[in-house]
Amino acid sequence: MNLKNRHFLKLLDFTPEEITAYLDLAAELKAAKKAGREIQRMKGKNIALIFEKTSTRTRCAFEVAARDQGAGVTYLEPSASQIGHKESIKDTARVLGRMYDAIEYRGFGQEVVEELAKYAGVPVFNGLTNEFHPTQMLADALTMREHSGKPLNQTAFAYVGDARYNMGNSLLILGAKLGMDVRIGAPQSLWPSEGIIAAAHAAAKETGAKITLTENAHEAVKNVDFIHTDVWVSMGEPKEVWQERIDLLKDYRVTPELMAASGNPQVKFMHCLPAFHNRETKVGEWIYETFGLNGVEVTEEIFESPASIVFDQAENRMHTIKAVMVAALGD
């Protein structure tokens, strides 16, 4: 199997065997780092990190992973990148491709990262777009594999909340590609697009995955091993949108009751972070004062419980991103 010089844009581009190879490599690299026997396989390589959207986990994961492996990075922050403003995506790709061995892009439309990949001449990695979040999916799959105690194709998980964007889309495709029992619990107006659902069903035909989309949150989580969620509203959206979304999604909040509805005492909670789970941030306090909610998509009780594996998930961003880069660029 050859992952050398491969772009990493979306899971739809990969076979189940290739996705599993990334997970196996990530597990090896993680074990090597923990044991203090990591071998640098990217010495002399340079990677450009284009961030049109800010990030804590993605940036730190790419930077630490690259440095662990002996590579250099250049961080292009949102205010520094001219991409699409003074310089076209096509030209930016060709310039950076002459200077760097790979390019990471985190930003808006999937079409941007696809165009970068078309013209860069070097591997391009998707750090997040509106449509897909493939590096997060490797982290999620590795975390589920570590905590499940059984093969992924015998594992069930649910995503509850707003499923229209990168997390809902990507988790549906991940489950389909890896032969999992994947459920989406959301109001139908917040389901992934018909195109994504069709792609998931097509992948499931090959892998034997089971796909369920339901408006009933309790039905979605019945007998699952993992319950995933994400934020309901993006920062910068008006107060009216927050109120509307909170009203629409209140039954999909991850509470002790929803966890119990799984019927699985070992069920685990997952979240890509950041999460609105208490009043300890300015946003959290504003939400409490405005809507009377202490925590939005998940309660503090669940977030801080032994069932929560969100920080294992966050750590695994780094190990899985390292696997993507080593597979593409490693000696």
Curated annotation (Swiss-Prot):
Binding residues for L-ornithine: N166, D230, S234, M235
Keywords: Amino-acid biosynthesis, Arginine biosynthesis, Cytoplasm, Transferase
Gene3D superfamilies, per database record: Aspartate/ornithine carbamoyltransferase (3.40.50.1370)
Pfam families membership: OTCace, OTCace_N
GO biological process: arginine biosynthetic process via ornithine; citrulline biosynthetic process; L-arginine biosynthetic process
Associated pathway: Amino-acid biosynthesis; L-arginine biosynthesis; L-arginine from L-ornithine and carbamoyl phosphate: step 1/3
Subcellular location: Cytoplasm
Binding of carbamoyl phosphate, residues: S55, T56, R57, T58, Q82, R106, H133, P134, T135, Q136, C272, L273, R317
InterPro entries membership: Asp/Orn_carbamoyltranf_P-bd (IPR006132), Asp/Orn_carbamoylTrfase (IPR006130), Asp/Orn_carbamoylTrfase_sf (IPR036901), Asp_carbamoyltransf_Asp/Orn-bd (IPR006131), Orn/put_carbamltrans (IPR002292), OTCase_ArgI (IPR024904)
Enzyme class: transferase
EC assignment: 2.1.3.3
GO cellular component, one term: cytoplasm
Similarity comment text for this entry: Belongs to the aspartate/ornithine carbamoyltransferase superfamily. OTCase family.
Protein name in UniProt: Ornithine carbamoyltransferase
Naturally occurring in which organism (per UniProt): Neisseria meningitidis serogroup B (strain ATCC BAA-335 / MC58)
